[in-house]
């Protein structure tokens, strides 16, 4: 069906023409400036999307080797641009002239066949060099893709390293701020960071104040109690008459007149001797 649609062209050639002609894939594969070649602008996307859709593989190297067997040549060493004398835009009737080299050599006969064989031999010699160059270029593309992947991974690792280095600095700055902020420190220690830290800190402060006030009250109560006991035994409440008169355990001490005259206090008795001769 594809061969009939392509005017007898080989299925591979016709599928390639359809991919190149599709304007929706110009960012991946499209015609060159002169419409006599096609360019694979993005080999990676081409091998991942278009090749599996049209062929049974996604190997870009296999696709390039297949182009070589049909006589396509790489015309630009710096990009994937291929050309064939019969592969022209809008000239689908020429596609049937693009055949595999082995088929062209085997199908020729007589004198014309000799010329075709010579052409095939020449193409084969040149094709071998082109195939080697294609393999090298394909390997370069693969290495570039791997390099891009490695660069992305390195960039991601570097971002993680920077994040890891930034977190301790942020934690240190936070701790320094907390140490300098008493309310925040109370919230972290007492409130658990649940939004009730200020109330908890205030309650703790009030608790300390209440305990201090309670202690002071108890101390004052003890002082008052001790004061009452001391007042109960004050000078007005104690009878010292027996102490001086000997009514209890202490006998009276007699003082003679001479001693009284020397002491200057007649009629005064003491329970103990008084030395007034200093």
Curated annotation (Swiss-Prot):
Give the protein name, as stated in the record: Heat stress transcription factor C-2b
The lineage's top-level taxon is Eukaryota
Q: What is known of its domains?
A: The hydrophobic-rich region (HR-A/B) corresponds to the oligomerization domain.
- Among the record's GO biological process terms, what is one? regulation of transcription by RNA polymerase II
Q: Which UniProt keywords apply?
A: DNA-binding, Nucleus, Phosphoprotein, Stress response, Transcription, Transcription regulation
| Keyword match Phosphoprotein | yes
Concerning PTM, the database record says: Exhibits temperature-dependent phosphorylation.
InterPro entries xrefs? HSF_DNA-bd (IPR000232), WH-like_DNA-bd_sf (IPR036388), WH_DNA-bd_sf (IPR036390)
Subcellular localization, as worded in the UniProt entry: Nucleus
What family does the entry list? Answer: Belongs to the HSF family. Class C subfamily.
Organism of origin is Oryza sativa subsp. japonica (Rice)
Which PANTHER family does this UniProt record tie to the protein?
HEAT SHOCK TRANSCRIPTION FACTOR, HEAT STRESS TRANSCRIPTION FACTOR C-2B
Asked if the keyword Transport belongs to this entry, the reply reads no
**What function does the entry list?**
Transcriptional regulator that specifically binds DNA of heat shock promoter elements (HSE).
């Amino acid at each position: 069906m594809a061969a009939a649609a392509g005017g007898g062209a080989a299925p591979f050639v016709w599928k390639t023409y359809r991919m190149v002609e599709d304007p929706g894939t110009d960012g991946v594969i499209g015609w060159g400036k002169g419409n006599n070649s096609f360019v694979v602008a993005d080999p990676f996307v081409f091998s991942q999307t278009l090749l599996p859709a049209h062929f049974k593989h996604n190997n870009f190297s296999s696709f390039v080797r297949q182009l070589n067997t049909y006589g396509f040549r790489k015309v630009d060493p710096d990009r994937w641009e291929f050309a064939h004398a019969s592969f022209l835009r809008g000239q689908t009737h020429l596609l049937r002239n693009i055949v595999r080299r082995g088929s062209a050599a085997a199908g020729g006969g007589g004198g014309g066949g000799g010329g075709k064989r010579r052409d095939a031999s020449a193409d084969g010699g040149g094709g071998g060099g082109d195939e080697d160059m294609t393999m090298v270029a394909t390997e370069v593309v693969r290495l570039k893709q791997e390099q891009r992947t490695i660069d992305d991974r390195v960039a991601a690792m570097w971002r993680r390293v920077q994040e890891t280095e930034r977190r301790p600095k942020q934690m240190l700055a936070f701790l320094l701020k907390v140490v300098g902020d008493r309310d925040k420190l109370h919230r972290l220690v007492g409130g658990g960071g649940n939004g009730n830290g200020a109330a908890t800190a205030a309650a703790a402060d009030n608790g300390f104040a209440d305990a201090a006030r309670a202690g002071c009250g108890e101390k004052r109560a003890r002082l008052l109690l001790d004061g009452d006991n001391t007042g109960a035994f004050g000078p007005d409440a104690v009878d010292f008459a027996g102490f001086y008169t000997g009514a209890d355990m202490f006998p009276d001490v007699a003082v003679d007149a001479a001693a009284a005259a020397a002491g200057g206090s007649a009629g005064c008795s003491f329970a103990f001797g008084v030395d007034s001769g200093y």
